[in-house]
């Protein structure tokens, strides 16, 4: 009996030594006290309770998420552009132009001192018109009328087709190429001079199938032009823009090359327009200086985005009378949010252009003083 007691004492002592347990009354106790055990047990219960709530909430959130996705899919079904689905995101290169009809006037155009459109740009413009055969074309920015002549020539065999051209400049040389070289085209041409596009849009009317924009190049230039014509365009209208890479391609071999480096407006709005992109064939996507966009359906869902593009720092400020005309136009054809964005942008840039000496130089470049 004594041996058993001795063995028990030795084992107890060893356990105390192993777990470093000591007691004042020399009674053996376990490492975890009752209070610590209850505390851990309580924590475990709380954790399990929260886990159950989380799993339940996850199921509820998943159900709500699926219902939202279902609603979005219904919305997208109504508003998603068919072309956007079918075309994907790749650009389309017009490799094979119909050039026969252009070749008829090519020599005459080359002999006439005309605006700066290179051979491939002229062929591209002709190719777009021949491919899509628009009935109603609008041109903004005419100058001598080289592009006007190309488009008029391209629609000679398109029944009931007509070109409307607008230029802010009202001097005599505007459209001279058409008047002098191609008077036989005049039956399909209407020219407006001396005011902004908003002034003439109601006269021209809706269902415009194609727009060619080649105007100020400085901001807000082509951005404003696009906003002014947008409410009058047909579904899937073609937007063709020239000089969309001036800020990249301008080098010292061009007259006024340094100024061209600041010509961002065509690049900005062309790459903001929601539509399928058409470019001349070539490897370098950045340096194509002409391109086209075929608008996606339901452009109204992009209206606010287009007005926000105006929010940059303008390089010139239009005449106040033009600003007022545009305000009335926007009030009539866009919603109140678009008008608010326009007003805020105008107020900012009115101060900015006047205070910035660099922009005051652009303010005197005859864009808004003709």
What residue spans do the PLM features occupy?
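Class I SAM-dependent transferase core
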Residues: 91-117
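S-adenosylmethionine/decaboxylated-SAM
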Residues: 14, 18, 111-370
């Amino acid at each position: 009996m004594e041996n058993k007691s001795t063995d028990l004492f030795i084992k107890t002592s060893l356990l105390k030594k192993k777990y470093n347990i000591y007691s004042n009354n020399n009674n053996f106790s376990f490492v975890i006290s009752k209070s610590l055990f209850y505390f851990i047990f309580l924590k475990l219960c709380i954790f399990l309770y929260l886990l159950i709530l989380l799993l339940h909430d996850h199921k509820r959130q998943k159900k709500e998420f699926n219902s939202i996705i279902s609603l979005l899919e219904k919305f997208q079904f109504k508003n998603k552009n068919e072309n956007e689905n079918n075309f994907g995101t790749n650009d389309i290169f017009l490799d094979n132009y119909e050039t026969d009809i252009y070749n008829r006037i090519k020599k005459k155009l080359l002999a006439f001192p005309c605006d700066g459109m290179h051979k491939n740009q002229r062929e591209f413009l002709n190719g777009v018109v021949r491919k899509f055969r628009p009935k109603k074309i609008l041109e903004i920015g005419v100058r001598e009328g080289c592009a006007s002549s190309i488009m008029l020539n391209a629609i000679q065999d398109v029944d009931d087709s007509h070109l409307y051209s607008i230029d802010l400049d009202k001097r005599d040389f505007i459209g001279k190429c058409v008047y002098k070289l191609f008077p036989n085209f005049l039956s399909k041409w209407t020219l407006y001079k001396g005011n902004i596009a908003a002034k003439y849009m109601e006269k021209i009317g809706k269902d415009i199938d194609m727009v060619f924009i080649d105007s100020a190049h400085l901001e807000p230039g082509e951005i404003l032009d696009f906003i002014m014509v947008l409410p009058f365009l047909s579904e899937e209208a073609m937007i063709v823009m020239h000089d969309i890479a001036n800020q990249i391609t301008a080098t010292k071999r061009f007259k006024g090359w340094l100024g061209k480096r600041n010509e961002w407006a065509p690049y900005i709005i062309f790459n903001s327009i929601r539509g399928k992109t058409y470019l001349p064939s070539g490897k370098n996507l950045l340096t194509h200086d002409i391109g086209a966009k075929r608008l996606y359906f339901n452009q109204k869902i992009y209206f606010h985005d287009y007005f926000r593009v105006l929010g940059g720092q303008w390089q010139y400020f239009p005449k106040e009378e033009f600003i007022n005309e545009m305000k009335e136009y926007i009030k009539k054809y866009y919603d109140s949010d678009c008008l608010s964005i326009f007003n805020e942008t105008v107020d900012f840039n009115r101060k900015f252009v006047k205070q910035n000496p660099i922009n005051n130089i652009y303010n005197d470049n005859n864009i808004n003083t003709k």
